[in-house]
């Protein structure tokens, strides 16, 4: 079934066309600093991880993980292999991060490891990758109550190192399973004109064995391949589908398909089939070559030329028959058997100079052999339509666009992104949204029982979208708008992480070093403000605040909750109190 082309429906009441911008506020933000017992387990890119995709996936990795099921609880993994947790009850009485789990093996001995990754699957389940290719499914008990010992329920080596980007917990017919989405970047030996790497998304389902209440095993393993790291990828809460936002499409690789095949997207078929015949043409005639079985004779061949048709039989077996693209001189057309066991047919065109796009109408069994000299002549005839320069004279006649209105920060260098939904059973694409120039900004978990939301730039605004897998006709809901944030963030060249509060009260971004920018939603004014230009009272204002951290270490992690911002560096964890009203 062909995928449905969909669009994202913007809710007009959530837009503010009269938004005037953010006002810089100098109100101080309470900031607290914790020194870590051991440094964060940062894994730097190796010399062989040189592509942009490696940088997106691993170089910009967020080492701080927020437990969406329990507000203000964050985790990180240190270089001793410990998962450390900080749960905030009171800002002024912060305790030290505590160890909740320790990796069973010393991963620092692995030269080719990636950063360890963790995802909070449910209130009592966690999935973990140690960065060496081993997957753990861990039962944590109720993390919101008194701390319980984390217990490994499943662990298995899955090949090359990967990171976990999403997971869900499923309970169907009293059978518990955990679905996990893994990401790898692997070498593509046959890719001669690309980066030499491809991105692999693996959808793994781990299910409890019926005969053993504590034994889990892999029951499903799907692989998708693409040429770009997805901006967003998540499994639907019911496990029936997968949504991906990426600027290059992903394709499902079936289990029996050769995994070493070329990933060239322009290739229409995955398996190269030898053409039944080859043909070439000049302005006056066509030559068709058909491979014959050994020891074929003229008596085995029957050919009928008609002005608009051709019929070829070999030992009474139909080889080629159908309507020709254009008329031929059937009396002047000939055929002969060559020494290399091939049949050569010469067809004389009635309409000289007409170039045929196909030999027999609708027939796909042949291959056109193009003459290099002919291709050069065609290119020369089309030369006046092309240029080596991009719009070499934009001011001539009518310019293509008003270059003065286009700012440098508005230029997108990536290709047009798309949002795709894959069915979990058939693995076919069911819905496609062409995002065009709607730049992906960030994702956030608003409700942990739902899929993560994603934020896209629409004109100057940033719009937050909540996927709903249960609504087939309207799968993506516009739930919030951050006014002018799409435009504002584009000018922040050094931004590293982007986030927003789950209640949409503010959005925040941090740079690679030290600075954090906070953009609040418009709030009512406590005093009267008058706009003299428009002659009206201003009822509310949107504030911008800037926090500067007292550190020279690069920022490795960034998470936002309704009340706080958490910022992780190599040696410190900073807590910024953003909202004080309860």
UniProtKB/Swiss-Prot annotation:
Which positions fall inside the CS domain? 272-360
The principal localisation class reads cytoplasm
* Keyword annotations from UniProtKB, A to Z: Cytoplasm, Nucleus, Phosphoprotein
Give the domain of life: Eukaryota
Sites where Phosphoserine occurs are at 7, 387
The record's listing under PROSITE patterns reads: CS (PS51203)
Gene Ontology CC terms, in alphabetical order = cytosol; nucleoplasm
- Where can this protein be found? Cytoplasm; Nucleus
Identify the Pfam families for this entry.
CS (PF04969)
Name of the protein this chain belongs to = NudC domain-containing protein 1
- Give the gene that encodes this protein: Nudcd1
């Amino acid at each position: 079934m062909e995928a449905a082309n969909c669009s994202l429906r913007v809710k007009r009441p959530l837009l503010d066309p009269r938004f005037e911008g953010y006002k810089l506020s100098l109100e101080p933000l309470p900031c607290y600093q914790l020194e870590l017992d051991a440094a964060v387990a940062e894994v730097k890119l190796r010399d062989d991880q040189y592509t942009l995709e490696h940088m997106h996936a691993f170089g910009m990795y967020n080492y701080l993980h927020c437990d969406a099921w329990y507000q203000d609880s964050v985790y990180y993994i240190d270089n001793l292999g410990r998962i450390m947790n900080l749960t905030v009850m009171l800002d002024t009485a912060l305790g030290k991060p505590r160890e909740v789990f320790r990796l069973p093996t010393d991963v620092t001995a692995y030269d080719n490891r990636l950063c360890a990754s963790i995802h909070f699957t449910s209130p009592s389940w966690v999935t973990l990758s140690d960065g060496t290719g081993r997957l753990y499914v861990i039962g944590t008990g109720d993390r919101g109550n008194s701390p319980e010992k984390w217990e490994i329920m499943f662990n298995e080596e899955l090949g090359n190192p990967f990171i976990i980007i999403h997971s869900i917990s499923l309970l169907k017919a009293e059978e518990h399973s955990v679905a996990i989405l893994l990401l790898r970047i692997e070498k593509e030996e046959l890719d001669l004109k690309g980066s030499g790497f491809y991105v692999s998304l693996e959808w793994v389902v781990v299910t409890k064995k019926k005969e053993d209440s504590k034994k889990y095993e892999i029951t499903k393993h799907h692989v998708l391949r693409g040429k770009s790291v997805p901006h967003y990828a998540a499994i639907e809460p019911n496990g029936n589908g997968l949504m991906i936002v990426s600027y290059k499409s992903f394709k499902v690789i079936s289990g029996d398909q050769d995994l070493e095949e070329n990933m060239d997207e322009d290739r229409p078929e995955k398996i190269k089939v030898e053409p039944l015949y080859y043909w070439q043409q000049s302005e006056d005639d066509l030559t068709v070559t058909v491979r014959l079985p050994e020891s074929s004779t003229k008596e085995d061949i029957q050919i009928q030329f008609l002005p608009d048709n051709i019929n070829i039989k070999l030992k009474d077996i139909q080889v080629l028959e159908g309507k020709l693209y254009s008329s031929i001189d059937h009396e002047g057309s000939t055929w002969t058997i060559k020494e290399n066991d091939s049949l050569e047919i010469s067809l004389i065109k009635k309409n000289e100079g007409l170039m045929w796009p196909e030999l027999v109408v609708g027939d796909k069994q042949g291959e056109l052999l193009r003459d290099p000299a002919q291709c050069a002549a065609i290119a020369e005839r089309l030369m006046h339509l092309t240029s080596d320069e991009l719009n070499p004279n934009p001011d001539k006649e009518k310019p293509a666009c008003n270059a003065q209105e286009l700012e440098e920060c508005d230029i997108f260098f990536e290709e047009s992104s798309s949002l795709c939904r894959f069915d979990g059973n058939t693995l076919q694409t069911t819905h496609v949204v062409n995002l065009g120039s709607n730049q992906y900004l960030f994702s956030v978990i608003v409700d942990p029982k739902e899929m993560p939301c994603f934020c896209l730039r629409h004109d100057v605004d940033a719009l937050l979208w909540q996927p709903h897998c249960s609504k087939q006709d309207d799968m993506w809901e516009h739930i919030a708008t951050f006014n002018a944030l799409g435009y504002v963030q584009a000018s922040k060249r050094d931004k590293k992480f982007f986030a927003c509060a789950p209640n949409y009260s503010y959005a925040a971004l941090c740079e690679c070093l030290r600075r954090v920018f906070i953009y609040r939603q418009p709030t009512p004014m406590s005093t009267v403000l008058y706009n003299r230009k428009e002659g009206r009272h201003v009822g509310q204002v949107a504030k911008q605040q800037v926090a500067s951290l007292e550190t020279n270490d690069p920022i490795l992690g960034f998470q936002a909750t309704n009340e706080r911002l958490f910022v992780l560096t190599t040696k410190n964890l900073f807590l910024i109190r953003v909202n004080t009203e309860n």
